[in-house]
Amino acid sequence: MASATFSVAKPAIKANGKGFSEFSGLRNSSRHLPFSRKSSDDFHSLVTFQTNAVGSSGGHKKSLVVEAKQLKVAINGFGRIGRNFLRCWHGRKDSPLDVIAINDTGGVKQASHLLKYDSTLGIFDADVKPVGTDGISVDGKVIKVVSDRNPANLPWKELGIDLVIEGTGVFVDREGAGRHITAGAKKVLITAPGKGDIPTYVVGVNADAYTHADDIISNASCTTNCLAPFVKVLDQKFGIIKGTMTTTHSYTGDQRLLDASHRDLRRARAAALNIVPTSTGAAKAVALVLPTLKGKLNGIALRVPTPNVSVVDLVVQVSKKTFAEEVNEAFRESAAKELTGILSVCDEPLVSVDFRCTDVSSTVDSSLTMVMGDDLVKVIAWYDNEWGYSQRVVDLADIVANNWK
């Protein structure tokens, strides 16, 4: 019986002489890896540098248009994504967005404190302070803070809100998100998978199809944003027949710190003590942005005791015979062209903490790419499920502004 062939990518392969992916705002050379420093102070300095630099080099370049309408933006839900979004937006130069309001039930003191001090991101390099009982100041810009759990009651009409960043994870269907429209907002961008007929867009994959006619849209999930760009490359270059994926995902606020009641019996268990298998719709959701892959992908999630950064493990059968180096070169080519700022390729033997605050949606770990036989492909891709995702939310909001009529 003939033995199966097996190929593993060689880590020595370089792209354009670079041994590491281009993280926006960071150095390109592998001799100066920005994450090689070990102290937390150095990491927090790095975050500060990235946040300041992302305006000039971060984000999806295709979405930047000089003369876009500046939209009045409100953030509904000032949790992990809400605060990451504000930091990402604050770092952009010449943004077509103007954040003027936040709906948060915790009050201005808590909102300003948690924005300034973050256990994952470090201290925000901005002057942040409460303004009275209904506002926070960020580098002198006052943002109004309101508090109401029902979006229909929010003062969006009074404030002239054009776009709401829906970050609660609660109002994800047309009825719920539509309450913002009822309150006077013109459009809603959901920072989670949408339900029902809400259009889903992933920057770098199908966001070019957005039109001004869409009043409520979804930015999909962080995992779909990681998965879809490199799946698109695989399908275009090699033809995906079928596949499965596992995301090893940092724990989130939906889990329990200690064993406690939860509708998901596994998520009811202590997040910091367990590997928690659970469901994810990320693989199936790829079909929402790449319709040709409907019914071809499925997957699960393993929630692990880390606070941030996750990694996708995708295994697919392809129709075109290939080998590991060819797969990686396809990723490099796309990362240098149509997926610049969205996809990157890393040749260094790194671990999850090294990918904190990376601006791209997914970073393929080239040394872990494998091909069994000549048609079974395994790809590993890292993603910052908070920061990287929030950069895409800003990008998609920019696209909304650039298509405003």
Curated annotation (Swiss-Prot):
First and last residues of the transit peptide: 1-68
Principal EC category: oxidoreductase
Pathway: Carbohydrate biosynthesis; Calvin cycle
Pfam families per UniProt: Gp_dh_C, Gp_dh_N
One MF term in the entry's GO annotations: glyceraldehyde-3-phosphate dehydrogenase (NADP+) (phosphorylating) activity
Residues reported in the UniProt entry to bind D-glyceraldehyde 3-phosphate: 221-223, 252, 267, 280-281, 303
Residues that bind NADP(+): 80-81, 104, 149, 385
GO biological process, one term: reductive pentose-phosphate cycle
Main localization, broad class: plastid
GO cellular component: chloroplast
UniProt cross-references to InterPro entries, sorted A to Z: GlycerAld/Erythrose_P_DH (IPR020831), GlycerAld_3-P_DH_AS (IPR020830), GlycerAld_3-P_DH_cat (IPR020829), GlycerAld_3-P_DH_NAD(P)-bd (IPR020828), Glyceraldehyde-3-P_DH_1 (IPR006424), NAD(P)-bd_dom_sf (IPR036291)
Alphabetized UniProt keyword annotations: Calvin cycle, Chloroplast, NADP, Oxidoreductase, Plastid, Transit peptide
Catalytic activity from the UniProt record: D-glyceraldehyde 3-phosphate + phosphate + NADP(+) = (2R)-3-phospho-glyceroyl phosphate + NADPH + H(+)
EC number: 1.2.1.13
Keyword Signal attached: no
Active site: 222
Keyword match Cell inner membrane: no
Site features described as Activates thiol group during catalysis, chain residue numbers: 249
Protein location: Plastid, Chloroplast
Protein family membership: Belongs to the glyceraldehyde-3-phosphate dehydrogenase family.
Miscellaneous comment as given in the Swiss-Prot or TrEMBL entry: Plants contain two types of GAPDH: cytosolic forms which participate in glycolysis and chloroplast forms which participate in photosynthesis. All the forms are encoded by distinct genes.
Subunit structure and binding partners: Tetramer of either four A chains (GAPDH 2) or two A and two B chains (GAPDH 1).
Name assigned to this protein: Glyceraldehyde-3-phosphate dehydrogenase A, chloroplastic
Source species of the chain: Pisum sativum (Garden pea)
Gene this protein is translated from: GAPA
